Structure formats: structure tokens, C-alpha cells
Amino acid sequence: MSKSRLTVFSFVRRFLLRLMVVLAVFWGGGIALFSVAPVPFSAVMVERQVSAWLHGNFRYVAHSDWVSMDQISPWMGLAVIAAEDQKFPEHWGFDVASIEKALAHNERNENRIRGASTISQQTAKNLFLWDGRSWVRKGLEAGLTLGIETVWSKKRILTVYLNIAEFGDGVFGVEAAAQRYFHKPASKLTRSEAALLAAVLPNPRRFKVSAPSGYVHSRQAWILRQMYQLGGEPFMQQHQLD
């Protein structure tokens, strides 16, 4: 290898190492800060806003209103656990069994990719990372997930998740969603309304709370059954998530 190539390689290596240190400090500081402080915005919110501006849509506003867990209906927390991650109170950030099932499914159905992200993983991804699928992003997501699982309580993870989850075009967080779709605060959401909001979470840019498709209605009904099977509101109290 020539001297010039060695110099370029050395420069790139130093740059990447420094970048990794900067990102580690930034993300580590974010994890520490948001363990107690309200989250003003997420990486996904920034990405959506910038994308709208780049496409000339200056009317788009990524909107979110932070609320604490005691200002959120217990049905809402239960609904997203029933819909997205029923082992949330028990795991350490990853549901290994679900990951194995998703990998097996994806091998058989390459055109219908199934995910297995837990609420903890989705929180890490939405808060700190860009959208998309890549091994680099998955690796960073895993590290950030371990970080928030180590520093935050399960209640804190659920609180942040509910405040940054995307529920529609420009609608982020359960308070903004409750006000937009039901004209009430998140604390007043009923069991059925919570299940409807949770039903669009797989793809809130495709599935609409304001105009639910047959699939969304069937998923809402399934979530309601799962909420009942989990034990209803006592489930949240039992795991200190309310």
C-alpha cells in the first residue's frame, strides 16, 4: 500500500473514531438528560419536518405536547403494550423469541418483512436515529436500547414512547393525538379510543385514525381482546407502569 493511501486510511480511521466518540457522548448525554427531563422533539420529528420543507411543504408542522404518565389514560399504555410488546415489563429491551419468529418469517416471505422491535427499541430509534433499515442503524439501535434500559425505568421508557410516537401526519405523542382526533386530553381517552390509536402504530402514515380502514378496525378489536387478556388496568398497576 502506498504512503498516500496509508495517509488517507489513517485520516478516515481517526475521523470515524472521533465521530463515534462524539456520538457516544451526545447519545449518552441524551439518555441521562431525558431520564428526568421532558423530550422536546425526537429525531423522527426532525426528519419529518426537514423532509416536508425539502419537498416545499411549509405548512407541515411536527407537533407534540409533552405530558407525564399521570396525565395519560392507563388504557393508552395498556393498548400499546397489547399491540406492540406484550413482554415489555419482563424483557431487558429485546424479545428474543419474537426476533427468531420474525427472522424465520422473513426468510419465507422476502416481500413481506415483519419486524420484532420492542417498545424500548422503538423508543431508542424514534428518539435518536434516522428512519430506514440497515445493519448500521440496527447496531446503533441495539446499543441505545441497552442504554435506556440500563438508565431508565420501564415507566419512563413507556412515558417517552407515548410522547414521541407518530400517530398521523404531523401528529406526535398521545396528547396531540387525543386532541386532534377526539378533542379531549390524553387523560380522558377511553379503552376503545386507546386501542384505535394503538392500531395505527405499525404504519401511522398509511393507516388513519380519522378514517380507519377495515384492517384498522379489525386490529383495534384484536387489541381490545389482548388488553382484556392481559388483565386490564390492574396489569399497569401490577408492573408499576401507571
UniProtKB/Swiss-Prot annotation:
It comes from the Bacteria. InterPro entries: Glyco_trans_51 (IPR001264), Lysozyme-like_dom_sf (IPR023346), PBP_transglycosylase (IPR036950), Pep_trsgly (IPR011812). Keywords: Cell inner membrane, Cell membrane, Cell shape, Cell wall biogenesis/degradation, Glycosyltransferase, Membrane, Peptidoglycan synthesis, Transferase, Transmembrane, Transmembrane helix. Belongs to the glycosyltransferase 51 family. HAMAP family: PGT_MtgA. GO terms for cellular component: peptidoglycan-based cell wall; plasma membrane. This is Biosynthetic peptidoglycan transglycosylase. It is found in: Cell inner membrane. GO terms for biological process: cell wall organization; peptidoglycan biosynthetic process; regulation of cell shape. Its EC number is 2.4.99.28. NCBIfam families: mono_pep_trsgly (TIGR02070). Peptidoglycan polymerase that catalyzes glycan chain elongation from lipid-linked precursors. The keyword Cytoplasm does not apply. It catalyses: [GlcNAc-(1->4)-Mur2Ac(oyl-L-Ala-gamma-D-Glu-L-Lys-D-Ala-D-Ala)](n)-di-trans,octa-cis-undecaprenyl diphosphate + beta-D-GlcNAc-(1->4)-Mur2Ac(oyl-L-Ala-gamma-D-Glu-L-Lys-D-Ala-D-Ala)-di-trans,octa-cis-undecaprenyl diphosphate = [GlcNAc-(1->4)-Mur2Ac(oyl-L-Ala-gamma-D-Glu-L-Lys-D-Ala-D-Ala)](n+1)-di-trans,octa-cis-undecaprenyl diphosphate + di-trans,octa-cis-undecaprenyl diphosphate + H(+). Pathway: Cell wall biogenesis; peptidoglycan biosynthesis. GO terms for molecular function: pentosyltransferase activity; peptidoglycan glycosyltransferase activity. The chain crosses the membrane at residues 19-39. The keyword Transmembrane applies. It is a single-pass membrane protein.
